[in-house]
Amino acid sequence: MNGAYRGALSRLLSKPFFLPLLSGLLLGISFPTWPAVHLEPLAWIALVPLLLSLEHEERFGPFFRKSWMSMLLFCLIALWWVCLATFVGGILTVFVQSLFSVVPLVVFYYFKKRAGFRSALLALPFIWTGWEWAYMQQDFSLGWLTFGNSQANLLWMVQYADVTGVWGVSFWLLTFNVLVLLLFMEKESFQVKVGIVMVMLVMIATPLLYARQVFRNTALDNTSPKVRVALVQPDIDPHEKWDGLGPEETLSRLYSLTGQSVRGERLELIIWPETAIPFYIRLPENKPYMDSVRRMVMRWNTPLLTGFPDEVPVFPNSARGEAVAASGAEYAAYNASMLLHPAGGPVQIYRKMRLVPFGERVPYSEYFPWLERLSFSMSGISSWAKGREATVMHFTSRDGQPVRMANIICYESIFPGQVSTFVRRGAQFLTLVTNDGWYGTSYGPWQHAAIDRLRCIENRRAMARCANTGVTLFYDICGRSYAETPWWQQSVLTADVPLESRITFYTAHPDLVPHVCLGIAGVLALVAAVRKR
């Protein structure tokens, strides 16, 4: 029996795509899914089978096919749920993301050919981490599958992100994978094996010790001022919201839920989710609805932050998103949020700056308008224009103190550099509005919520996360959830949010780690170019 088992295993291992697909499987399931599933440690070894299969692959064609098959399976497992919102768009997302994920492995192939496999392994963490950052600087980036995001729910292992950001977590994981492979490959020196094991143990212990100190300091420091915030989860089907409900019924639901939340509470901020108001409420013909919202804010005597589609006039032939005809003028449409004060005054508006590729906007369509034909509309939502300013909103607390906050709209929380910009501009806490109802009961919304933890840790800012159908919750500065609503239920969640003013090392230097990695990778590439193998 044992012989038959070993024979079957040997035949399986001899299949050219078994090890690459095994890596793709391990990578895919290591990313956050539902709350009860914790397979994050698999990411610490997930790349080993793929790299092992590439050791003796000298021709680029087979090398690329193995790498791409691995990344394709990885992306399919981690991102299949995107197809629930738009099937064709989801397939395109998985395909494009897998191609971009292969890029660091193509560079690894160059190093391998010039400097040998072991030298290329040592360069891989620098190559991969630098590429992850570079990839996120352009509009095609989904940014979801940054390697470090796999550890988002493993809070004891990622607290050092306040120093390195998620980039440091990626580098840490990649280095550990390389060490595991080097340990497997070492056949001669017992001392070398012991040395590698010792380094691996240090790499496990260091984040744990750092986290222990962070949690201890957080428990001791309970002096931060707080604001009382209510999160309204209306639980409206997103397709129904855009295609079925009228303005009166939509606002009526929101008013009813919000009215319940203000009874007996000294609230200082009310938050409605992304596009909670699903029509162009600032257009002149919708002024009665805008006046209605203002009256309710005055009645509640509490500032209101809400998502809504905004529109501004644009000049002919200017770069813009979808044009909306109104009173003979031309408008650019934005996915936006606004803050209204009970005392009246100007509305504070933030317009979403990072848009979902192909779902909300076709990348670079402002330069090539014909690309608009490639958009995949979700109930008519597509072709938003890009916001240009990271606006920090402000209001006054009950005790008269000024409060500054960031508002992140949905997918933007995937971009660490953008969130840190809000904090450098003075945001004392983070708010996030989202509508993850497009993805049903898949683990997509939970994956999104998990990644949001990292933004809290990196900047040491609490987050009030308001979702249309869930996941609605509050995170503290360590990424721990301390209040949460049931999923797919109408509800209101109220809690105190701590305000912070300190700036972490990461917030002050958000691009330091990837820049260093790119610099070292560049130097190693020059060395490899002139080195004889």
Curated annotation (Swiss-Prot):
GO CC terms of this entry: plasma membrane
GO biological process: lipoprotein biosynthetic process
InterPro entries: Apolipo_AcylTrfase (IPR004563), C-N_Hydrolase (IPR003010), C-N_Hydrolase_sf (IPR036526), LNT_N (IPR045378)
Biological pathway: Protein modification; lipoprotein biosynthesis (N-acyl transfer)
Transmembrane segments: 17-37, 72-92, 116-136, 165-185, 190-210, 510-530
Positions of the CN hydrolase domain: 232-499
Alphabetized UniProt keyword annotations: Acyltransferase, Cell inner membrane, Cell membrane, Membrane, Transferase, Transmembrane, Transmembrane helix
GO molecular function: N-acyltransferase activity
Compartments, record wording: Cell inner membrane
Annotated Pfam families: CN_hydrolase (PF00795), LNT_N (PF20154)
Membrane topology: Multi-pass membrane protein
EC number: 2.3.1.269
Coiled coil residues, start to end: none
Active site per UniProt: 274, 352, 410
Stated family: Belongs to the CN hydrolase family. Apolipoprotein N-acyltransferase subfamily.
NCBIfam families linked: lnt
Function (record text): Catalyzes the phospholipid dependent N-acylation of the N-terminal cysteine of apolipoprotein, the last step in lipoprotein maturation.
Protein name: Apolipoprotein N-acyltransferase
Encoding gene (name): lnt
